Amino acid sequence: MSAKIYPVLKSAKARTLIDNERYQKWYQESVEDPEKFWDKHGRRIDWFKPYTKVKNTSFKGRVPIKWFEDGLTNVSYNCIDRHLKTHGERTAIIWEGDNPYIDKKITYNQLYDYVCRLANVLKKHGVKKGDRVTIYMPMIPEAAYAMLACARIGAVHSVVFGGFSPEALAGRIVDCESTFVITCDEGVRGGKPIPLKENTDKAIDIAAKQYVIVNKVLVVRRTGGKTGWAPGRDIWYHQEIATVKPDCPPVKMRAEDPLFILYTSGSTGKPKGVLHTTGGYLVYTSMTHEYVFDYKDGEVFWCTADVGWVTGHSYIVYGPLANCATTLMFEGVPNFPDQGRFWEVIDKHKVNIFYTAPTALRSLMGAGDQFVQRSSRESLRLLGTVGEPINPEAWEWYYHVVGEDKSPIVDTWWQTETGGILISPLPGATDLKPGSATRPFFGVQPQLVDAEGNVLEGPADGNLCIIDSWPGQSRSVYGDHQRFVDTYFSTYKGKYFTGDGCRRDEDGYYWITGRVDDVLNVSGHRLGTAEVESALVSHHQVSEAAVVGYPHPIKGQGIYCYVTLMAGQSGDYALREELVKHVRNEIGPVATPDKIQFAPGLPKTRSGKIMRRILRKIAEDDFGALGDTSTLADPAVVEDLIANRQNRTAS
């Protein structure tokens, strides 16, 4: 654990929105009287009909969660219309293309026009309030227009990351019974085309076999590449928006009406459709965006995530736009054309706040400081990290080399299910410790418990729970509320269990130690081990598979697969490569296995349960303390696994 402390910078303290005194006061108010606290802060967004009920939540029984429930509002209105009178000509979105010579700026007035036109196209084709629209797009402004257009008319968007395979896309279309898809001819990443329309066509065929029929596909032209075309079903975006009016009144939405579904990996194979609603989500994302990033009017904010993940939803689109910020959308990757790209973009667009993932930082750190030092980065005043815990070495590099000791780092911890940031430093209030997410945001009450559910006080190491609701919290798993209750509220009764392990130090700072369930965190992306296992087992030569994570110098966690083959098959390099390709096709590049170990058998108890603890230890090249193996049906299996491990450290 890092013992270093970096006190609040004088420059940050001088112009901050929240200093330590205010943090302590507000935090106390927020946990002692959440009703009063959120009644005040709920007014940060505009309401067509103001709420009179603030908080109506319980973590027991059926876990009903309602915030501002009798208020009427609209997310699209709050992100666009309310800014037009005073800031219509301000840049809302800076788009930086994959090609460093291509970019564009979209003002709030233009954003209104694009979003209203797209909303009218959706209405023209029969999309109405409550309908699910799947968005499978690259990082282009039209992805944000699509989200905001859905929100404008009350349709529920389900954004699917453009790196997911046709099979993964189909599963998400089927689960929410989406009949309208918005996609693009091709995406571009690192100079390479990505066949999004082709993937969409394949996904629609797969979905049709499961009796979910997609009626319309709206296609944005990005590259002009050749695409298949289904007349009557497929329609061009540019043709459609030219034929509709540039105004579309926002639908008055109840605070608890659904806003979006976002699929995330569970410890079972089937992805969960995490459901977020309208009012509480927007209050929370706009508030965390303002206070965690100490956002000042007119600043340029760049979150490097993809809109296919929750970070992109909350901190590229909804949070910044609700606050009338200028938000930067980046189509490319950190190492194209070379490893200096991030820093060049910061200079080019005078970025003030930069929010990225530790994975990206570790890989850029490995490329050498010269790429950073080519740029001035003089506009930067705040740095942030998201997606996974950051190791102290990468934190120090980020602080000293990228930030030149002038920019505080907000190491933020949160999840798809939380809607927004839960634990994070505030730049003008919190002394920093490299690797620690530090203290809870307003209204967030963390608690550490041991495996039996006993509450741990003071400095301790345990499982991280949250004991009361906050407005940004997910309300359900789409179409399966029981799964929501079982996944998050049954392990420790009356508490939201995050699935993360955590340490609290003597100063009350929180240190996230990683997942305690069967979910991997690969490059900041959550991936269920069961998903990867079922992809492997779907290959005709594979009999059984077990997947665990292991420490990876760049990705944080790597994917280590133990594979047992069908009788008569033998594992070789060619099959290993074939299985890697197979998993990529089934799930997407994010799930690419790092190590595949062929094994004659897996370590199982006599009742047939795989002992993953042993597999994790071997994958970590740490088998000196495997613990009790007396319950194993065949202890000899372990010796073979150790002898043939793929991750041995060179001695």
Swiss-Prot record:
The gene is acsA. Its cofactor is Mg(2+). Mg(2+) binds at residues 537, 539, 542. CoA binds at residues 189-192, 311, 335, 523, 584. It catalyses: acetate + ATP + CoA = acetyl-CoA + AMP + diphosphate. The modification N6-acetyllysine is found at residue 609. The lineage of its organism: Bacteria, Pseudomonadati, Pseudomonadota, Alphaproteobacteria, Hyphomicrobiales. It comes from the Bacteria. Belongs to the ATP-dependent AMP-binding enzyme family. Its EC number is 6.2.1.1. Signal peptide: none annotated. NCBIfam families: Ac_CoA_lig_AcsA, PRK00174.1. GO terms for biological process: acetyl-CoA biosynthetic process from acetate. One of its GO terms (cellular component) is cytosol. Catalyzes the conversion of acetate into acetyl-CoA (AcCoA), an essential intermediate at the junction of anabolic and catabolic pathways. AcsA undergoes a two-step reaction. In the first half reaction, AcsA combines acetate with ATP to form acetyl-adenylate (AcAMP) intermediate. In the second half reaction, it can then transfer the acetyl group from AcAMP to the sulfhydryl group of CoA, forming the product AcCoA. This is Acetyl-coenzyme A synthetase. It holds the Pfam family ACAS_N. ATP binds at residues 387-389, 411-416, 500, 515, 526. GO terms for molecular function: acetate-CoA ligase activity; AMP binding; ATP binding; metal ion binding. It is an enzyme of class 6 (ligase). It comes from Agrobacterium fabrum (strain C58 / ATCC 33970). Acetylated. Deacetylation by the SIR2-homolog deacetylase activates the enzyme. Keywords: Acetylation, ATP-binding, Ligase, Magnesium, Metal-binding, Nucleotide-binding.
